Amino acid sequence: MRLLYSLFHCSAFLVGFTLSVGVLPIPNEHAASIKAKFDDYAEHYLLPEDFHNAETAPVKKPTDAEIESMQNSLLFEGDIMGVPEIEKSDILKRLRDDPLLDEDEIFRKPFHSALNLVTYPDKLWPEGQVPYMLEEGMTNDQRTAIAQAFDEYKTKTCVRFVPKTDDDFDYIYVKRNVAFGCSSYVGRAGGNQTVSLEVDKCFSKGIIAHELMHALGFFHEHSRTDRDDFVDINEDNIRPGMMRNFEKYPRKIIDSLGMPYDYESVMHYHKLAFSRNGKPTIIPKDNEADVGQRYKLSEMDSKKVNKLYQCGEYSKTSSTTTTTTTTTTTTTTEEPTTTTEVEEKPKDKKVSSTTTTTKKPTTTTTTTPKPVERSRNKKCEDLNAHCGMWEQLGHCQHSVKYMAHYCRKACNLCEVEVTTTTTTTPKPVPRNKEKENKSASSTTRGTSTATSTTPKTTTTTTSAPKEKCEDKNLFCSYWAKIGECNSESKFMKIFCKASCGKC
């Protein structure tokens, strides 16, 4: 993909064309193939408009009944892929009755994964970067929901979902299904691993965030070794054959990361999970607890992700820089009365005077440095993991509003470095006053005077260019004439607004 980036600049589209018998320039094979490739990348990765829509679109809160309808009884715990169906009952029986001797028996390579990094040290995504690719044909609403889930992790954790490149062997492939529920592997499974989302059921921020948290390496909260201290499992209400979805894991497989049990986790089963009669299957011991939300990452979810991936407050390197401010303490003392004779010698006469100094306060200022945290967000940086790719695809010019805010560095729209110049010009001192000061300083104790000036700071900011509604490609008129405006072409929507009447 990197080799293709340079081809997407507008200048590339002008290379090689033929003129029709009439007026419109007709693109040659090279120009047509570049348009097709642009559309291909736009299909498989999110665009600025998807994240813009994610900010304004309402976030759906699925009900317990809706969540229950997404469960797939053929999958391990309803949504976990990678566990062979034939061996589930036997494996889980031995999990209850006997310590697990060979962890690969439950998660066969290359699909095994779990939280315990002593057991599974290679199942995290390196540096918290998760390459992804989308199935083509996603609707705008589906892309918006995925963008909302990606933003949820971007806002609360250090994990980033980034466009897959040719160098990425391991990546998640987000695809749609019909009547198969929502599902994912747990952790980095190796190669192309699927996050599958049922159409009309699974495309909401919280549901997708749940499946992505599986992909990051997390099981359901009720599977924790210590879960019996926090919830009761009512077997009488569980559908026949579904008890296997309520098992606990031994510590060899699952690691709680030293975090408390979280009723509010997006990974917790809801009360009616796999219910046979509409009555609760999971009952919190805390009567006020509500479990099973699929709306957002809880505070504890975010901490778990950050701790597992050693970032945020759990980073080995501090994420903030430190500066200092000052604390001032003032103490006032009184000086004794002092009489001083001052002699002035003008050219023609001699004047003798006596100056009486009354009691006056002397101020002593003590300055103590105080550390203050400064956020990294003040730096000029891109706020979306897609910015590099978008810049190469020309979105700095064609998605101006979003890019100017979230991709300032990639689009070279950062503030010019601020330079502050302070010049202090002392006021002229009258000759007589200067002599008086010199004389006084030789006969009395010195006092210190602190003077502070407030410099003027000039900041020059490069503003984002205004977006014009015009065609950005020579061949837009031709493509519009042959009906491309009515297609799903992202290229036409971005580069051919005038010809397509989208101004």
Swiss-Prot record:
Record's protein name: Zinc metalloproteinase nas-14
Gene3D superfamilies, A to Z: 1.10.10.1940, Collagenase (Catalytic Domain)
Glycosylation-annotated residues: N192, N437
GO molecular function (one): metalloendopeptidase activity
GO cellular component, one term: extracellular region
Cofactors named for this entry: Zn(2+)
Disulfide cysteine pairs (residue numbers): C158-C311, C182-C202, C380-C414, C387-C407, C396-C411, C469-C503, C476-C496, C485-C500
Listed Low complexity bias regions: 317-340, 352-370, 439-464
Keyword Hydrolase: yes
Cell compartment(s), UniProt: Secreted
Encoding gene (name): nas-14
